[in-house]
C-alpha cells in the first residue's frame, strides 16, 4: 500500500513539473512570437516604456542605466576647472556623466541651464536639449530644424521630457538603426572621408547612432528669413576630425564660445569628442563599433539580445574585451590602469600650467599690457586649453586613443608653457618681476576667486525646480508626452 502511495505521489509531482515545463515552453514560444511580430508602436513614440511589450530584455537592460546614479562633482575633484572656465557656465556646475536614464534630470537640475521663469528667459539656447531626449528628433520632424534651434532652452521644457532612449537610435516601425539628427550626416559629407548615412554598413551604424551626440560640436549662429537667429548644432569637421583639424576650422572662422573672464582669451569649449577620439585609436581603425563594447550581445535561454545597459565595458569583460583579447582580465586591467595613470598625470600638469597662464595674463592686462603684446599669448592659451579640454571632455580618451591623448595633452602643456614664457617678458616690461599666480586649492576658493555668486545661483535654481520645472512635467503629462510613473522612486541628486 505504501509503495502505491509513493508511486502516486511521484506521478503527481512529475505531472506538476511537466505542466510547469510546458507552460514555460509556451510562454517562451509566445514571447518569441511577440519579439518576431511587427511592433505596434507609433513612429514618433518617445515614451521609452511603450517599447517594453515587444522588447522586454532590451528595455529592462536600458532601465538599468538608472543604477548609474552617483553624482561625481568634477569641479570638486579638479577645482582648476573653475578658473579654466571662468566666465562660462561650466565654472558653476560640472559633473561626470550619469546613466542615460538621467539625461533630462541632469540638464534640468544643472546650474548651467540657469533658472528661467518662462519660455523666453534663461541663459542657454534650445540647442542645449539636442542630445538629451528622443523628443528632440520628433520636434525637429514636426517643426523643422530652423524652428527647433530658435529660442531659449526653456521654450521646450514641456515638450522634451523623456530621457535618451529607443527612438534616438531605432526606427520604431522596423527597429532598424537610424540617425534622427541631420547635422551628423551634414558633417560626414563635409569631412568627405567617413561613410555617410547613405553608404554606412550595419557595423558603421552601430557607431554612428552614438556619434549623433558623442562628438565635438558648436552652436552656429544662423540668420533666418523670418528675422530670427537659429543657434544650430554644427560639427566642425570640414577640415577633418583630429584636434588640429578642428582647431584650424575654429581659427579660420574666428569662432569662440566665450571670452575668458580673467585672461580675455577668446576660448573654445570642447564638448565630448568620443567619436573623433575613437577614430584615431586601435578600435576605431579596426572598426570595432561603440556597441561591440558598450552594448554586448547577451544570451538568455534561446534568446540572444543586445544589452542596452550602456556603460563601462570593463564591468562585462567576458562579453566585451575577452571576445578579442587573448590575455587574462587581470593583465588587461593593469594595462588600462597604467594608461589612465599616465593620462591623469599629464592632465593635472596641463590644468596647472593653463590656469597659471590665465592668471598671469590677467595680471598683464592689469599692469597695462597692450592688445598687440598679448595677441600671440592669447592664441597660445586658446590652443593650449582647447587641446587640454579635447582630451579631458572625452572621458574615455585614455582608453580609446591613449597615444593620441598623451600627445594632445603634451602639446597643451607645451603651448601653455610658451604663453607663460612670453607673459614673463611682458610682465617684466611693465615692471612686474615677482608675480606668482595663486594656487587653486578647492572648488569654493576657485569660485570665490572668479567672483561667482554661488548662493544666489543655487537659490534661484531651487525656485525654478520647485516651480516652473514641475509645471513643465504637468503640462507634458496632459499632452500625453510624459508618464510620471516612469520616474517613480527617482531621487533628485545634484552637486550643490
UniProtKB/Swiss-Prot annotation:
Predominant place of localization: periplasm
Record keyword RNA-binding present: no
Binding site for heme: 128, 131-132
Residues annotated to bind heme c 4: 290, 293-294, 400
Co-factor note (free text): Binds 1 Ca(2+) ion per monomer.
Positions with a binding annotation for heme c 3: 100, 210, 213-214
Family label: Belongs to the cytochrome c-552 family.
Function according to Swiss-Prot or TrEMBL: Catalyzes the reduction of nitrite to ammonia, consuming six electrons in the process.
Name of this chain's protein: Cytochrome c-552
Amino acid at each position: 500500500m505504501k509503495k502505491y502511495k509513493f508511486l502516486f505521489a511521484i506521478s503527481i509531482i512529475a505531472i506538476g513539473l511537466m505542466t510547469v515545463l510546458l507552460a514555460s515552453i509556451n510562454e517562451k514560444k509566445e514571447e518569441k512570437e511577440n519579439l518576431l511580430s511587427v511592433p505596434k508602436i507609433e513612429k514618433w513614440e518617445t515614451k521609452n516604456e511603450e517599447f517594453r511589450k515587444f522588447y522586454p530584455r532590451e528595455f529592462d537592460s536600458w532601465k538599468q542605466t538608472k543604477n548609474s546614479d552617483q553624482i561625481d562633482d568634477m569641479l570638486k575633484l579638479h577645482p582648476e576647472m573653475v578658473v579654466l572656465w571662468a566666465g562660462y557656465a561650466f565654472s558653476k556646475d560640472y559633473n561626470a556623466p550619469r546613466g542615460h536614464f538621467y539625461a533630462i534630470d541632469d540638464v534640468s537640475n544643472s546650474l548651467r541651464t540657469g533658472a528661467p521663469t518662462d519660455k523666453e528667459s534663461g541663459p542657454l539656447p534650445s540647442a542645449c536639449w539636442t542630445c538629451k531626449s528622443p523628443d528632440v528628433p520628433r520636434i525637429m520632424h514636426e517643426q523643422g530644424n530652423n524652428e527647433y534651434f530658435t529660442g531659449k532652452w526653456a521654450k521646450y521644457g514641456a515638450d522634451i521630457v523623456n530621457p535618451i532612449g529607443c527612438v534616438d537610435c531605432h526606427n520604431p516601425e522596423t527597429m532598424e538603426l537610424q540617425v534622427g539628427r541631420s547635422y551628423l550626416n551634414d558633417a560626414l559629407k563635409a569631412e568627405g572621408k567617413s561613410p555617410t548615412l547613405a553608404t554606412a554598413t550595419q557595423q558603421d551604424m552601430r557607431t554612428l547612432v552614438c556619434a549623433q551626440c558623442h562628438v565635438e560640436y558648436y552652436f552656429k549662429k544662423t540668420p533666418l528669413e523670418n528675422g530670427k537667429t537659429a543657434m544650430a548644432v554644427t560639427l566642425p569637421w570640414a577640415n577633418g576630425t583630429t584636434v588640429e583639424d578642428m582647431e584650424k576650422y575654429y581659427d579660420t572662422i574666428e569662432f569662440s564660445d566665450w571670452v575668458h573672464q580673467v585672461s580675455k582669451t577668446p576660448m573654445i569649449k570642447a564638448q565630448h569628442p568620443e567619436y573623433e577620439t575613437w577614430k584615431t585609436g586601435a578600435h576605431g581603425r579596426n572598426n570595432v563599433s561603440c556597441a561591440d563594447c558598450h552594448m554586448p550581445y547577451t544570451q538568455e535561454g534561446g534568446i540572444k539580445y543586445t544589452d542596452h545597459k550602456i556603460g563601462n565595458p570593463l564591468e562585462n569583460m567576458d562579453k566585451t574585451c575577452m571576445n578579442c583579447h587573448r590575455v587574462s582580465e587581470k593583465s588587461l586591467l593593469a594595462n588600462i590602469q597604467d594608461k589612465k595613470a599616465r593620462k591623469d598625470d599629464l592632465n593635472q600638469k596641463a590644468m596647472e600650467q593653463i590656469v597659471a597662464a590665465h592668471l598671469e595674463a590677467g595680471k598683464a592686462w592689469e599692469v597695462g599690457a597692450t592688445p598687440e603684446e598679448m595677441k600671440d599669448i592669447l592664441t597660445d592659451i586658446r590652443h593650449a586649453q582647447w587641446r587640454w579640454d579635447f582630451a579631458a571632455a572625452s572621458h574615455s580618451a585614455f582608453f580609446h586613443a591613449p597615444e593620441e591623448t598623451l600627445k594632445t595633452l603634451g602639446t597643451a602643456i607645451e603651448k601653455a608653457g610658451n604663453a607663460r614664457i612670453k607673459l614673463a617678458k611682458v610682465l617684466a616690461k611693465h615692471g612686474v618681476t615677482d608675480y606668482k599666480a595663486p594656487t587653486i586649492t578647492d572648488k569654493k576658493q576657485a569660485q570665490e576667486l572668479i567672483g561667482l555668486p554661488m548662493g544666489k545661483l543655487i537659490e534661484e535654481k531651487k525656485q525654478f525646480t520647485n516651480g516652473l520645472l514641475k509645471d513643465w512635467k504637468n503640462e507634458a503629462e496632459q499632452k500625453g508626452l510624459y508618464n510620471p510613473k516612469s520616474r517613480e522612486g527617482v531621487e533628485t541628486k545634484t552637486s550643490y
